[in-house]
Regions:
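Short, conserved alpha-helical segments within structured domains
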Residues: 43-47, 67, 109
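Histidine- and aromatic-rich ligand-binding microenvironments
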Residues: 8, 106-107, 128, 141
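Charged phosphate-binding loop/patch that engages nucleotide di/tri-phosphates or the phosphate backbone
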Residues: 119, 123-141
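Short, well-structured N-terminal submotif of metal-dependent ribonuclease cores
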Residues: 1-40, 55-67
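Active-site neighborhoods of divalent-metal-dependent phosphate/nucleic-acid chemistry enzymes
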Residues: 77-125
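A basic- and aromatic-enriched beta-loop-alpha substructure that forms the phosphate/nucleotide-
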Residues: 50-51
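A generic "structured core" feature
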Residues: 37-40, 94, 139
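Alpha-helix capping/helix-boundary segments
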Residues: 44, 89, 130-131
Length: 141
């Protein structure tokens, strides 16, 4: 069983924001994971910081940029969490997954996350059902 978890931005947001629709599910999974490791990349980090400061998403819970960093720092203090730079070979895998004969702005991010997880040998953890069929190891919470 792969204990190297690459969390999608939706899972990070649910861990950081207690009013997220999936917060309880995410926190329970995270607590039960014990000594497993949890990784983020710059893309997922920026996405979460952006969402935390977006009133349309967060409503009255929207954070200032400084408050968003404060929340991120709280979770970053957990020794099981680490940042991963882009792995060697990511560009090739990302291009392979995103060279589609269609127009879909959402596929760019999905292709990137699936490529990152695949090349780095990580399990992608998400609430996004569409990622489950992406050909990488995906845990759907």
């Amino acid at each position: 069983m792969n204990t190297l978890n690459f969390l999608d931005a939706n899972v990070w947001l649910a861990l950081l924001w207690c009013r997220h629709v999936h917060s309880k599910k995410a926190r329970l999974w995270f607590e039960q994971a014990g000594e497993e490791q949890f990784f983020f990349c710059r893309f997922t980090q920026l996405t979460v910081l952006r969402l935390l400061t977006t009133e349309k998403i967060m409503g009255t819970d929207a954070k200032t940029m400084s408050e968003a960093w404060g929340l991120w720092d709280q979770i970053w203090a957990d020794s099981r969490i680490a940042f991963l730079a882009e792995p060697q070979g990511l560009e090739r895998e990302f291009r392979t997954r995103s060279r589609l004969p269609s127009r879909s702005p959402k596929v760019w991010a999905d292709a990137y996350l699936l490529a990152f997880a695949s090349v780095a040998g990580l399990k992608l953890v998400t609430f996004d059902r569409g990622l489950k069929s992406g050909g990488a190891e995906v845990l759907l919470l």
